[in-house]
Curated annotation (Swiss-Prot):
The keyword Cell division applies. Belongs to the ZapD family. It comes from Escherichia coli O139:H28 (strain E24377A / ETEC). The lineage of its organism: Bacteria, Pseudomonadati, Pseudomonadota, Gammaproteobacteria, Enterobacterales. This is Cell division protein ZapD. GO terms for cellular component: cell division site; cytoplasm. Transmembrane segments: none annotated. Interacts with FtsZ. The gene is zapD. NCBIfam families: PRK05287.1-1, PRK05287.1-3.
Amino acid sequence: MQTQVLFEHPLNEKMRTWLRIEFLIQQLTVNLPIVDHAGALHFFRNVSELLDVFERGEVRTELLKELDRQQRKLQTWIGVPGVDQSRIEALIQQLKAAGSVLISAPRIGQFLREDRLIALVRQRLSIPGGCCSFDLPTLHIWLHLPQAQRDSQVETWIASLNPLTQALTMVLDLIRQSAPFRKQTSLNGFYQDNGGDADLLRLNLLLDSQLYPQISGHKSRFAIRFMPLDTENGQVPERLDFELACC
């Protein structure tokens, strides 16, 4: 079976922000438990970038709007023959619950911003080599605490993001499932189409092609140019089949 590679591209600013947040939250747990300096810096750097993203926009407001929009979309399926009504009703209740938790939660990221260790590390991350033991003795001693103590603190930090994580996961899952993949063909490495008010493009490419897409556009129209990974010797076929979902 041939291996496919999935590419996703946002068609508006809110989706761009959501995908970045999703990526950074996933990165928080990749190297757990934290057992050394490298793992600690990976964790704190992603926390710092998350807080930077939170400060740039109304993440909570946009998510609450999307939770409401998804509920309205699901309500249009109530009573439609052949549709699993219990599943629809369960999803609506889950969206309502996620919205209630999110709206009553403290400011997103505030718990992390107020943590002394996180604040100290954030100040040093932009300095080359700025997290050495003599620059950050606080981090140095933290890394020598019992593993269980560090694990507990990390779990508390990550848990503070749960209201956001749960709402974002639901929203992105529903958006990704909102459109099926369809076979498309590019000509001379180029493809364009109308977005139909989509928020997200999802594209499957065969790994064997060693091509990647450069995508530009917005929700009403987009263009895809396929580029070879090997810029000197790679070739783009005259006709290239791929799978595309406009979600």
